[in-house]
Amino acid sequence: PNLRASQAVEKLWEAILATSRVTEDPIAAWQAHNQDLHDRCAYLNSLHIRELHYKASNGTDFHVGMIPEARFCGGAEKSLQGIVFNPNIPSEECFISPMRGKAEGIVYSSKPLSYQSQLIDRFWIRFHEGKAVEWHAEENNDLLTKLIEMDEGSSYLGECALVPFDSPINQSGILFYNTLFDENASCHMAFGEAYPCIKNGSNMTRE
């Protein structure tokens, strides 16, 4: 904010390239990073986790149940045609689809949420039987309400993601005002439809 526009744009590009691992050898950097994410996911999957319990000094105390046979995913994926690709760059998360109806407790934000070019900040959300039933934001509460009450499924969780504290995006100290970047700064949850991150999920019908 204290830089001229041209300097700010240059600094932003530097931050984007650094957090996206565009180094002298980005292919090698991403191969190593993908392997690290896959190893983390494999370890988490080996634990056969039935529930995640989030507890923090900011007041968060939240339980969310996992779908049986759900899998942690992260990093590069392989398409049904056998093509290996990275769906998101940058990406620091190991994510999983939670069980609908199995979320209880309260979650407090540790970072602001950029939504529709506005910031929702200093907010909390209380869940009961999987659904967001109560919430409040000190900044842009009406926008948070709009997000949660968008449609029938928007008050239920579709993703829980684990992100290391030493994530390059978190270490940068920058709020990018872009979810693809900002979600990779900390552990997070997402409302709405879940990904089929479940054993043999791509072969299942919606029913």
Where are these regions (language model features)?
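Active-site bordering "gate/hinge" segments
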Residues: 1-104
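Flexible loop/turn segments at secondary-structure boundaries
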Residues: 1-2, 60-63, 71-73, 114-117, ...
